[in-house]
Structure formats: structure tokens, C-alpha cells
Amino acid sequence: MTKLKVAVLFGGVSTEHEVSIVSAKSVMQNLDKEKYEIIPIGITKEGKWLLYTGKIEDLDSKWTMYSIECFISPDRTKKALVKIKDSEATFIDIDVVFPVLHGLNGEDGTVQGLLELSGIPYVGCGVLSSALCMDKAFAKKLALLEGIPQGHFLVIYKDEYLSKKEYFIRRIESEFSYPVFVKPANSGSSVGISKAKDKDELILAIHEAFLYDTKILIEQAINAREIECAVLGNSEILVSALGEIVPSREFYSYEAKYIDGSSELIIPAKLEKQVEDEIKELAVKIYKLFECSGMARIDFFVDKETNKVYFNEVNTIPGFTSISMYPKLMEYSGIPYPQLLDKLIQLAIEKNQQKQSIKYSKEG
């Protein structure tokens, strides 16, 4: 049997570079070696593309020591990786690309744009859905137009804030009640997110968020449970059982996710049937609204007192580490990790084949 050549992208110019490496290592260890030839491609924090030549089990933060310069060609007549060694270029055919890039410059439509140009099938959402879901401000505005329930929010741009700081602080304090969350609009793994309980903390939180983006969100804090839902599919959509995150800290921060490791994941989440059904229906509606494909993890809040459901965000390349909710939810729902990867690759190929019927010329 001819093996499919699967290029796995990891790293990236992102605050989630290290998390991406852990996710990609997990993906590559669970890909069926009888079906796939794995081509590990790392992107450094500086944006250099390198073919990783070491062992998958040894992949860590020192991966660049075992690498060769490379890049994916945007030439769709090639559909290949270009390996550069001793000033000579060699083309390596690629059948599918599996981007395991979290955050900016990987999950935001940028890499997806390159892969569209290349014509190579790739796992996950396309350019538009990736960009929309990565930008929490646009995602919330679009969800608002469709009547999807969510907490009160305000979008602030850095240049406007710097010229009118007092105005924005007054506006926030008039529209919201403490505590509030302050988030970079384009960030993941809770990087740059703070919970502010008073004016002093608010000012510090805004400063922190602007370190990671030029656009931030102010969100009303809700006394809520954090519920996550895994979604799989293109036109036919599968929604997983629901999971609950019980943070070890005040909220599910970067430290709570990846450093202290003591946050609890409950699968399935213990919810009333009506609430569970509402979340699953909303997940499908949101998945279709953002034109997602392949996969996404959609996160919600459930008010602890009223059971009211609120949309939080969509992750188009969810974590694939050993502690990540997406593969755990799918496994609980009857799709083991290796089969999940098979399905994602199959969905990528199917989506690419559908595009082959699109005409790009009036001739012929």
C-alpha cells in the first residue's frame, strides 16, 4: 500500500510556539505509520521553515539542531516541499498538510492562504473561517448579528486608547461591573488575558493585553462553568459529548493549562439535558456560521445560578496534547485518537477534491 505523505507543521511565530510542538509531537506519535509517511516541518519563532530530521520521540524545544532549510512551494503545479541543502533544491511531494500551529501566523488564515495557493489538501478550517475565529472581536460581532447569546463586550483599539485613556476607563466602568476580563483580540491559550477586579487592575490588564495585540476585548465576567464541545466534519457535522474545565486558578489561564497541570477535565460534563441540547445546537449553528471545516473546538459558559448558556470562542486548531480536551472528547464519543487523525486527513482530501470542480477561467 502506498503511504500518504503527510506534512505536519509545528512551532510558528506565535506565543503558543511551545504548545504547538507538544501538540504536533502527540499527533505524529498517533498517526498510523502503516498508512502515512510523516514529514515534520517546523517554523522557528523568527519564521524560518525547517525540515525536522530527528526522531519524533525526541522532538522538543531544541528541535532546530536536527533540521534542514525548507519551505512549501506556493506553485500548485508542484504540490511539494522544497528542501534546500548545500545550495541545492530538492522537491519532496506532499499529499496532505496537517497544520498543528496554534495562535497567530498559523491558526489565523495566514498559513491556510499559503496552502490554498499550493493546492495541497490541508487539515482544518479555510482562510476565512480561520481568520474570523482567531479574531475574537470579529467572531463576537458576527455571533451578535446572528443572535447567539454571549456576555457583554467592548472592542478597543490601541491607538484610540492611548489618545483617550480616561474616556475608555470611564466607559468601561459605566458599561461593566467588576470583575471584567481583558483579552488580546488575537491570542490563544489564554496568553495575555487578565481578570480585573478594580480600576488599578483594569489599567494593568489593558497594558498587558496590548503587549500581544493592537486590539483588545473587555468582557463582563460571568460566574459560570466552562464547557467545551468538539466538532468534526465538513458538510456532515459530528458533535461530541461535552466536557467541563474546572480551573485550578481563578480562570483557565496559560499557567493553569500548561504549567501547574492541576486543572480538572470532566467528561462528560454533568449538565441538565435541556442545557446540553442547547449547547450542541449552538455548536452546530456556530460551526456553520463561521464556515468551519474539518474540526473546531467551541467553548461556552454556563451561568452557575441560572443555567443560561453563553458563547465564548471557537478554536480552529485545538490542542492535541495529552491533556487536550478535543481528542479526549472525541475518544469518549467513540473516535479514538488514531481514527480521529485518519478522519481529519480524509476530510481534508474531500474538501480539496470539491474545489477541483471550481472554474478559474471562462475558457474550457
UniProtKB/Swiss-Prot annotation:
GO BP field: cell wall organization; peptidoglycan biosynthetic process; regulation of cell shape
Catalysed conversion reaction: 2 D-alanine + ATP = D-alanyl-D-alanine + ADP + phosphate + H(+)
Magnesium keyword on record: yes
Annotated positions binding Mg(2+) 2: E313, N315
Cofactor details (free text): Binds 2 magnesium or manganese ions per subunit.
Disulfide bonds: none
Highest taxon, organism lineage: Bacteria
Residues reported to bind Mg(2+) 1: D299, E313
Reported cofactor(s): Mg(2+); Mn(2+)
Pathway the protein acts in: Cell wall biogenesis; peptidoglycan biosynthesis
Record keyword Cell wall biogenesis/degradation present: yes
Single Gene Ontology MF annotation: metal ion binding
Residue span, ATP-grasp domain: 140-346
Compartments (UniProt record): Cytoplasm
E.C. code: 6.3.2.4
Residues annotated for ATP binding in this entry: 173-228
GO cellular component terms, semicolon-separated: cytosol
InterPro entries listed in its UniProt record: ATP-grasp, ATP_grasp_subdomain_1, D-Ala_lig_Van_CS, D_ala_D_ala, Dala_Dala_lig_C, Dala_Dala_lig_N, PreATP-grasp_dom_sf
This protein's UniProt keywords: ATP-binding, Cell shape, Cell wall biogenesis/degradation, Cytoplasm, Ligase, Magnesium, Manganese, Metal-binding, Nucleotide-binding, Peptidoglycan synthesis
Protein function: Cell wall formation.
PANTHER family in the record: D-ALANINE--D-ALANINE LIGASE, D-ALANINE--D-ALANINE LIGASE A
Similarity comment: Belongs to the D-alanine--D-alanine ligase family.
NCBIfam families: D_ala_D_alaTIGR (TIGR01205), PRK01372.1 (NF002378), PRK01966.1-4 (NF002528)
Stated name of the protein: D-alanine--D-alanine ligase
